[in-house]
């Protein structure tokens, strides 16, 4: 699993070097190889190098298609652009695609959430991750003096997402994650099953021999 952060911001030369390092390890038993992408970084050249290096799952940060929400998060997503890129990704052989949806943004309404969840569903991802906005201390967001949405509305949004995705045959297998049958993330399940994992890179976490560490 390559991410979080935004590894897709690396240029092709940097990605080539990264995959050279990854190949130093025995990957013969790897069933799921995920790479996180910012939708704006996705190009044919990027997908080609991922396919060449056996990446078989993408996690794409859509977050929203609402201009006000995206402006608040300093992001950009256009539905038609995203749709074309996902078609291109599938045509190149990667069919296991997760899309992220952020909700509970200041001033967001349930109506806005419903509309954008429907757009996400039109893209037919195999997996959907939904995250409510969290205000972390000392971050730019926490210093903006914005007012979080009402907790009751946030709960209503969460319950709507849960029920809507269940009707669309997505299994709610983990707090924030929903998957079509057979597409539950092995990476996520590894955490939930309290299994071991190595974390490489700045700020990465790992869990070995009952000890959790942070770089």
Task: Name each region found by the language model.
Residues 1-215:
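C-terminal scaffold of the Radical SAM
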């Amino acid at each position: 699993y390559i991410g979080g952060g935004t590894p897709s911001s690396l240029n092709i030369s940097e990605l080539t070097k990264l995959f050279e390092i990854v190949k130093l390890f025995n990957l013969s038993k790897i069933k799921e190889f995920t790479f996180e992408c910012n939708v704006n970084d996705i190009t044919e050249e990027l997908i080609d190098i991922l396919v060449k290096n056996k990446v078989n799952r993408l996690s794409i940060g859509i977050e929203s298609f609402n201009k006000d929400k995206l402006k608040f998060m300093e992001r950009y997503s256009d539905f038609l652009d995203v749709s074309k890129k996902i078609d291109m990704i599938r045509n190149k052989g990667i069919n296991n695609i997760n899309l992220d949806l952020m909700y509970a943004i200041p001033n967001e309404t349930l109506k806005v959430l419903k509309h954008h969840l429907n757009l996400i569903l039109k893209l037919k991802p195999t997996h959907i991750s939904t995250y409510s906005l969290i205000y972390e201390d000392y971050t730019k967001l926490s210093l903006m003096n914005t007012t979080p949405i009402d907790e009751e509305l946030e709960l209503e949004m969460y319950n709507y997402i849960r029920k809507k995705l269940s009707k669309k045959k997505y299994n709610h297998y983990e707090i924030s994650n929903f998957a079509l049958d057979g597409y539950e993330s092995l990476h996520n399940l590894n955490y939930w099953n309290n299994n071991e994992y190595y974390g490489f890179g700045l700020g990465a976490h790992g869990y070995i021999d009952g000890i959790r560490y942070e770089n």
